[in-house]
Amino acid sequence: MQKEPEVSRRGFLAGLAAAAVIPRWAHGSRADIVVTMPRVEKLYKIAGCTQPNDLQFVPDGLWVLDQVDPNKAFKVRPKDGSILETLQTESIHGSGITYGHGALWIASTKMTDPATPPRTLKVDPKTGKTLKSWVTPGSGYYGAITPKSTPSGAHGLKWVGENYWMAVPASGKLFLMAPETGEIVRSIPAPGVRTHGLAWDNGLLWCVDSNERAIFKLNPADGTPLTKIQLKKDDPEPHGLDIDKGVLWYCDAASGWICRLA
């Protein structure tokens, strides 16, 4: 059995090094991509969900993951945010939710014990209990790092076909994962430092960079940015992301807003 990684001073220093990494396209093709600034519609806030951190549309509603610990997932009516189901999960500081193989898949971005590596959870959508879990690859440190920082795991998750995409900011990558084994199928470079929500759009992958208040459309073959949506400073900050009928929706864990691009 593969030994799970431990948090250590070596890991902390590795995180410092990773934080300085600049994407390979930062001074090249990214400067040439099309930038749009659509209007943001602030739709609603969900009662009892104060820090919505990711979104997943399903045929009978919209799943919203609340970051307040321990995390609850709310299934709501997309048109008005009225609650259909409330699910208590075992996730801590969760930042990603998706649905596939009859289960919810949730990124437990932190753990109750900070020395424990963050994990990705397969969750029973009726009980909220964890069915399986795997150590999240690429977990570590990013952004403003101090000795008191704790490792950060996955942020956005999005099911595509028989696998799911996962954004892990500390790694500087987006991983395509085999769900039932937790193994990496492949990876592509992330479009920014604080990558978050993901959405699948007719063979292309949208990815949020929360720090830049931007959403990038990527070629999932190699991570090349094709389009950039730039939000304004007074718009809610993008965290979670999904797409419905060709329209991007996002949520902001800081303000609580569920938003849609117009």
Task: Give the predicted meaning of each segment.
Residues 32-48:
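A short helix->beta-strand "capping" segment at the edge of beta-propeller domains
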Residues 40-45, 82-87, 131-134, 141-147, ...:
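A short beta-strand motif characteristic of beta-propeller blades
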Residues 77-80, 124-127, 178-181, 219-223, ...:
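Short loop/turn segments that connect beta-strands within beta-propeller blades
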Residues 240-262:
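Blade-level signature of beta-propeller repeat domains, shared across WD40, Kelch, NHL, RCC1
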